[in-house]
């Protein structure tokens, strides 16, 4: 039987004892069946251009989410992306992570932070943002769907891909970039020599450019753990500024406890229908925000450090979210003024460690981990 409607948004309201599932549906006003092969909801597929002979290129430093989506956007607009990524492609990266999980050693350039897809590849793929600087969030969902994501990405209020499915989606993004004339250089950390060649619009000798191309600019898409790159940028007079961030710990609980608290003694049938419960906590302590972050129902805690002799963790869930444990970051906001001495303009860590003011936050992180 053909469908008369399709779900375009789904959310769960667990604030009251009686659980409510809210659906927004798309239907023909005359009740006619909808096309079977139509995406849910309808969206314009991307139009990627063949750029093998493009005259203009842009260099992208980092193949995390920002770098990959920047590359795809450039291809849609007729500009050839050239990506430099310090880590490995996703299949090789998985091997290094498996070695780390067996306590057999950390590869400082290929781990839960560095490599194709960035930290997000092995960090769950929750597609939700509290930021008011949201941009075109729906287009992000559509592109993930285009590269193999589930239909639920297009209508779930808190969409989730899963760390088991993300590597395949990321690989397909890379294949698309290469197919349309882009370049990706793995195991290539942008050091001072390469950075200077890029900003001076000269081609490094070890790239594989097949023809002359004019470099229009450089997009920095590096992650928070690339401390060495930030220091290199500062040494090359790139303007940097201290910004606020959040730090904390990760708490783990039995998933059954969270289900009971959020769903009010749910039946196994209900859990099967709506999935394991998640939560969000926000409060103020002495005028400072404290909140849960990256809550992972049915998830795992993983070693997410990228440097030796440090302790950093993250959380992730597979697509089915069926681990017996839930976990969430519990973090507090760190403000730029927290790094100052006597509320003046001299960062505290500048005084103690001879650190430049713009990099004081990085030094603070290093002291804690």
Residue ranges of predicted features:
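Residues forming the flavin
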Residues: 1-122, 126-207, 211-369
